[in-house]
UniProtKB/Swiss-Prot annotation:
The gene is TPI1. It comes from the Eukaryota. Has antigenic properties. It is found in: Cytoplasm. Belongs to the triosephosphate isomerase family. GO terms for biological process: canonical glycolysis; cellular response to starvation; filamentous growth; filamentous growth of a population of unicellular organisms in response to biotic stimulus; filamentous growth of a population of unicellular organisms in response to starvation; gluconeogenesis; glyceraldehyde-3-phosphate biosynthetic process; glycerol catabolic process. The active site is at H95 (electrophile), E165 (proton acceptor). It comes from Candida albicans (strain SC5314 / ATCC MYA-2876) (Yeast). GO terms for cellular component: cell surface; cytoplasm; cytosol; fungal biofilm matrix; fungal-type cell wall; hyphal cell wall. InterPro entries: Aldolase_TIM (IPR013785), TIM_sf (IPR035990), TrioseP_Isoase_bac/euk (IPR022896), Triosephosphate_isomerase (IPR000652), Triosephosphate_isomerase_AS (IPR020861). Its EC number is 5.3.1.1. Homodimer. This is Triosephosphate isomerase. It is an enzyme of class 5 (isomerase).
Length: 248
Protein backbone atom coordinates (compact mmCIF):
# COMPACT_ATOMS: atom_id res chain seq x y z
CA UNK A 1 0.00 0.00 0.00
CA UNK A 2 1.04 3.61 -0.48
CA UNK A 3 2.07 5.24 2.79
CA UNK A 4 2.34 9.03 2.95
CA UNK A 5 5.94 10.22 2.82
CA UNK A 6 6.99 11.70 6.16
CA UNK A 7 9.96 13.90 7.06
CA UNK A 8 10.76 14.78 10.66
CA UNK A 9 13.31 17.36 11.75
CA UNK A 10 14.92 16.98 15.17
CA UNK A 11 16.68 20.23 16.07
CA UNK A 12 18.06 18.65 19.28
CA UNK A 13 19.48 21.24 21.75
CA UNK A 14 20.25 23.70 18.98
CA UNK A 15 19.04 27.11 17.95
CA UNK A 16 18.16 30.56 19.21
CA UNK A 17 14.95 32.53 18.71
CA UNK A 18 16.51 34.15 15.67
CA UNK A 19 17.74 30.85 14.21
CA UNK A 20 14.44 29.03 14.76
CA UNK A 21 12.60 31.92 13.13
CA UNK A 22 15.00 31.81 10.18
CA UNK A 23 14.62 28.04 9.71
CA UNK A 24 10.82 28.27 9.74
CA UNK A 25 10.85 31.32 7.46
CA UNK A 26 12.83 29.24 4.97
CA UNK A 27 10.18 26.51 5.15
CA UNK A 28 7.38 29.06 4.80
CA UNK A 29 8.93 30.42 1.60
CA UNK A 30 9.52 26.98 0.09
CA UNK A 31 7.18 25.33 -2.40
CA UNK A 32 6.70 22.15 -0.39
CA UNK A 33 4.98 19.07 -1.86
CA UNK A 34 1.36 18.87 -0.71
CA UNK A 35 1.55 15.10 -0.17
CA UNK A 36 4.54 15.08 2.22
CA UNK A 37 3.88 15.25 5.97
CA UNK A 38 6.53 17.28 7.81
CA UNK A 39 7.08 17.59 11.56
CA UNK A 40 9.78 19.79 13.08
CA UNK A 41 10.86 19.36 16.70
CA UNK A 42 12.59 22.43 18.13
CA UNK A 43 13.78 22.65 21.74
CA UNK A 44 10.86 22.87 24.19
CA UNK A 45 11.56 26.54 24.93
CA UNK A 46 10.79 27.38 21.30
CA UNK A 47 7.70 25.21 20.71
CA UNK A 48 5.31 28.16 21.01
CA UNK A 49 7.49 30.31 18.78
CA UNK A 50 7.60 27.59 16.12
CA UNK A 51 3.81 27.18 16.20
CA UNK A 52 3.33 30.94 15.81
CA UNK A 53 5.85 31.27 12.98
CA UNK A 54 4.81 28.23 10.93
CA UNK A 55 2.53 29.04 7.99
CA UNK A 56 2.84 25.79 6.05
CA UNK A 57 -0.30 23.60 6.21
CA UNK A 58 1.74 20.42 5.70
CA UNK A 59 4.18 21.24 8.53
CA UNK A 60 3.36 20.41 12.16
CA UNK A 61 5.34 21.09 15.32
CA UNK A 62 6.53 18.42 17.75
CA UNK A 63 8.33 18.19 21.08
CA UNK A 64 11.56 16.26 21.57
CA UNK A 65 10.48 14.70 24.84
CA UNK A 66 7.38 14.06 26.94
CA UNK A 67 6.77 12.75 30.46
CA UNK A 68 4.74 9.63 31.27
CA UNK A 69 2.36 11.38 33.67
CA UNK A 70 0.10 14.43 33.68
CA UNK A 71 1.26 17.80 34.98
CA UNK A 72 2.53 17.97 38.55
CA UNK A 73 5.66 17.94 40.67
CA UNK A 74 8.02 16.75 37.93
CA UNK A 75 10.71 19.41 37.69
CA UNK A 76 12.15 19.90 34.23
CA UNK A 77 9.67 17.66 32.44
CA UNK A 78 7.26 18.44 29.59
CA UNK A 79 3.67 17.21 29.89
CA UNK A 80 1.67 15.97 26.93
CA UNK A 81 -1.16 18.40 27.70
CA UNK A 82 1.32 21.30 27.61
CA UNK A 83 2.53 20.20 24.17
CA UNK A 84 -1.05 20.41 22.93
CA UNK A 85 -1.68 23.66 24.81
CA UNK A 86 0.98 25.56 22.85
CA UNK A 87 -0.33 24.20 19.55
CA UNK A 88 2.12 21.37 18.91
CA UNK A 89 0.80 17.92 18.07
CA UNK A 90 3.72 15.47 18.02
CA UNK A 91 6.54 14.29 20.24
CA UNK A 92 9.63 12.16 19.86
CA UNK A 93 10.10 9.23 22.22
CA UNK A 94 12.97 6.78 22.54
CA UNK A 95 15.68 8.80 20.83
CA UNK A 96 19.04 7.09 21.29
CA UNK A 97 20.51 10.16 22.99
CA UNK A 98 17.88 9.83 25.71
CA UNK A 99 18.32 6.07 25.89
CA UNK A 100 22.10 6.38 26.32
CA UNK A 101 22.74 9.75 28.00
CA UNK A 102 19.61 9.97 30.17
CA UNK A 103 19.46 6.17 30.65
CA UNK A 104 15.80 5.87 29.67
CA UNK A 105 14.66 2.23 29.64
CA UNK A 106 12.51 0.52 27.01
CA UNK A 107 9.71 0.33 29.58
CA UNK A 108 9.86 4.03 30.49
CA UNK A 109 9.84 4.98 26.81
CA UNK A 110 6.82 2.74 26.30
CA UNK A 111 4.98 4.41 29.19
CA UNK A 112 5.79 7.85 27.79
CA UNK A 113 4.58 6.78 24.37
CA UNK A 114 1.31 5.43 25.75
CA UNK A 115 0.61 8.49 27.88
CA UNK A 116 1.28 10.84 24.97
CA UNK A 117 -1.05 8.89 22.70
CA UNK A 118 -3.76 8.69 25.36
CA UNK A 119 -3.53 12.47 25.76
CA UNK A 120 -3.85 13.08 22.01
CA UNK A 121 -0.21 13.68 21.09
CA UNK A 122 1.10 11.72 18.10
CA UNK A 123 4.45 9.97 18.48
CA UNK A 124 7.62 9.44 16.48
CA UNK A 125 9.02 6.35 18.23
CA UNK A 126 12.78 6.02 17.76
CA UNK A 127 14.51 2.64 17.77
CA UNK A 128 17.95 1.41 16.71
CA UNK A 129 21.09 -0.50 17.53
CA UNK A 130 24.64 0.45 18.51
CA UNK A 131 27.67 -0.37 16.38
CA UNK A 132 28.58 -3.24 18.72
CA UNK A 133 25.07 -4.69 18.38
CA UNK A 134 25.21 -4.33 14.62
CA UNK A 135 28.57 -6.11 14.47
CA UNK A 136 27.09 -8.80 16.69
CA UNK A 137 24.30 -9.39 14.19
CA UNK A 138 21.50 -8.52 16.63
CA UNK A 139 20.10 -5.41 14.93
CA UNK A 140 16.59 -6.83 14.52
CA UNK A 141 16.64 -8.39 17.99
CA UNK A 142 17.35 -4.98 19.51
CA UNK A 143 14.68 -3.26 17.42
CA UNK A 144 12.17 -6.00 18.29
CA UNK A 145 12.86 -5.58 22.01
CA UNK A 146 12.37 -1.83 21.82
CA UNK A 147 9.16 -2.21 19.79
CA UNK A 148 7.76 -4.97 22.00
CA UNK A 149 7.96 -2.77 25.10
CA UNK A 150 5.49 -0.45 23.37
CA UNK A 151 3.26 -3.06 21.70
CA UNK A 152 2.72 -4.74 25.09
CA UNK A 153 0.82 -1.68 26.32
CA UNK A 154 -0.26 0.09 23.11
CA UNK A 155 -2.64 -1.69 20.75
CA UNK A 156 -3.54 1.17 18.39
CA UNK A 157 -0.53 2.29 16.34
CA UNK A 158 -2.41 4.62 13.98
CA UNK A 159 -0.75 7.69 15.55
CA UNK A 160 2.75 6.21 15.82
CA UNK A 161 5.48 6.70 13.24
CA UNK A 162 8.53 4.48 13.82
CA UNK A 163 11.98 5.96 13.20
CA UNK A 164 14.82 3.47 12.76
CA UNK A 165 18.03 5.25 13.71
CA UNK A 166 21.17 3.12 13.89
CA UNK A 167 23.03 4.75 16.77
CA UNK A 168 26.37 4.47 14.98
CA UNK A 169 25.04 6.61 12.13
CA UNK A 170 23.62 9.51 14.16
CA UNK A 171 25.69 12.66 13.75
CA UNK A 172 28.73 10.71 12.57
CA UNK A 173 28.49 11.31 8.85
CA UNK A 174 28.12 7.55 8.43
CA UNK A 175 24.83 6.40 6.95
CA UNK A 176 23.41 2.94 6.41
CA UNK A 177 23.27 2.11 2.72
CA UNK A 178 19.78 2.34 1.21
CA UNK A 179 19.89 -1.43 0.77
CA UNK A 180 20.78 -1.99 4.44
CA UNK A 181 18.04 0.39 5.55
CA UNK A 182 15.45 -1.30 3.34
CA UNK A 183 16.41 -4.73 4.66
CA UNK A 184 16.16 -3.59 8.28
CA UNK A 185 12.87 -1.76 7.70
CA UNK A 186 11.48 -4.87 6.04
CA UNK A 187 12.46 -6.88 9.12
CA UNK A 188 10.92 -4.29 11.44
CA UNK A 189 7.65 -4.39 9.51
CA UNK A 190 7.62 -8.18 9.57
CA UNK A 191 8.10 -8.11 13.34
CA UNK A 192 5.33 -5.55 13.76
CA UNK A 193 3.03 -7.78 11.73
CA UNK A 194 3.48 -10.45 14.39
CA UNK A 195 3.02 -8.10 17.36
CA UNK A 196 0.34 -5.63 16.23
CA UNK A 197 -1.14 -7.43 13.22
CA UNK A 198 -0.38 -7.38 9.51
CA UNK A 199 -2.89 -4.63 8.70
CA UNK A 200 -1.50 -2.14 11.22
CA UNK A 201 2.09 -3.06 10.34
CA UNK A 202 1.41 -2.37 6.68
CA UNK A 203 0.00 1.08 7.50
CA UNK A 204 2.74 2.08 9.98
CA UNK A 205 5.33 4.39 8.48
CA UNK A 206 8.95 3.53 9.18
CA UNK A 207 11.47 6.35 8.80
CA UNK A 208 15.23 6.14 8.42
CA UNK A 209 17.42 8.44 10.50
CA UNK A 210 21.17 8.75 10.72
CA UNK A 211 23.23 11.33 8.82
CA UNK A 212 20.51 11.95 6.22
CA UNK A 213 21.25 15.00 4.08
CA UNK A 214 20.12 16.72 0.91
CA UNK A 215 22.47 14.63 -1.22
CA UNK A 216 21.88 11.08 0.03
CA UNK A 217 18.11 11.35 0.63
CA UNK A 218 17.38 10.68 -3.04
CA UNK A 219 19.27 7.37 -2.85
CA UNK A 220 16.40 5.93 -0.78
CA UNK A 221 13.75 6.90 -3.32
CA UNK A 222 12.93 3.41 -4.60
CA UNK A 223 13.04 1.65 -1.22
CA UNK A 224 9.49 0.41 -0.58
CA UNK A 225 9.83 0.12 3.20
CA UNK A 226 11.58 3.46 3.78
CA UNK A 227 8.62 5.80 4.29
CA UNK A 228 10.61 8.94 5.03
CA UNK A 229 13.34 10.34 7.24
CA UNK A 230 14.02 11.65 10.71
CA UNK A 231 16.65 14.30 10.10
CA UNK A 232 19.06 15.73 12.66
CA UNK A 233 21.71 18.29 11.73
CA UNK A 234 20.45 18.83 8.19
CA UNK A 235 17.06 19.96 9.52
CA UNK A 236 18.78 23.15 10.71
CA UNK A 237 19.99 23.95 7.19
CA UNK A 238 18.32 25.00 3.92
CA UNK A 239 18.95 21.49 2.54
CA UNK A 240 16.08 20.27 4.76
CA UNK A 241 13.79 21.45 1.95
CA UNK A 242 15.71 19.23 -0.50
CA UNK A 243 15.08 16.24 1.78
CA UNK A 244 11.36 17.04 1.93
CA UNK A 245 11.35 17.14 -1.89
CA UNK A 246 13.52 14.03 -2.33
CA UNK A 247 10.65 11.84 -3.57
CA UNK A 248 9.70 14.21 -6.40
Amino acid sequence: MARQFFVGGNFKANGTKQQITSIIDNLNKADLPKDVEVVICPPALYLGLAVEQNKQPTVAIGAQNVFDKSCGAFTGETCASQILDVGASWTLTGHSERRTIIKESDEFIAEKTKFALDTGVKVILCIGETLEERKGGVTLDVCARQLDAVSKIVSDWSNIVVAYEPVWAIGTGLAATPEDAEETHKGIRAHLAKSIGAEQAEKTRILYGGSVNGKNAKDFKDKANVDGFLVGGASLKPEFVDIIKSRL
